[in-house]
């Protein structure tokens, strides 16, 4: 397993533990479709959260938030729409979030990254 892949998995583990500590329940992890991948799908109360996890060793080059490009955001939005259609959840409240992890800092939960 490559080092970056291991770091990514460790970042997802940390993000999931953080979200669970905030009351979220895991529905799916690394969900794939033709449009892309959703790192974590969790339920928080009556809302489904689609979570992009970004890990960086430090804030160099803009940090974790900088790595969510407009094209990545579009892929995420399309993946979310597809997931909702495939699971007949089009009337369920949902949101696209990010959990940013930079080095040893606590995770940062950014809610509604689509604006």
Swiss-Prot record:
Signal peptide from the UniProt entry: none
Transmembrane segments: none
InterPro entries linked: Restrct_endonuc-II-like, tRNA_endonuc-like_dom_sf, UPF0102_YraN-like
GO MF: nucleic acid binding
Domain of life of the source: Bacteria
Family membership: Belongs to the UPF0102 family.
HAMAP family in UniProt: UPF0102 (MF_00048)
Identification of the protein by name: UPF0102 protein NMC2069
The organism of origin for this protein: Neisseria meningitidis serogroup C / serotype 2a (strain ATCC 700532 / DSM 15464 / FAM18)
Lineage: Bacteria, Pseudomonadati, Pseudomonadota, Betaproteobacteria, Neisseriales
């Amino acid at each position: 397993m490559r080092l970056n892949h291991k770091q990514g998995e460790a970042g997802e583990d940390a993000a999931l533990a953080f979200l669970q500590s905030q009351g979220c329940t895991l529905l799916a992890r690394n969900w794939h479709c033709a449009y892309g991948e959703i790192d974590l799908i969790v339920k928080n109360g009556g809302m489904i959260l689609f979570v992009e996890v970004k890990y960086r060793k430090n804030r160099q080059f803009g940090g974790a938030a900088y790595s969510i490009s407009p094209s990545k955001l579009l892929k995420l939005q399309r993946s979310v729409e597809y997931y909702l259609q495939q699971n007949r959840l089009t009337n369920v409240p949902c949101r696209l979030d990010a959990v940013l992890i930079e080095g040893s800092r606590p995770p940062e939960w950014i809610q509604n990254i689509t604006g």
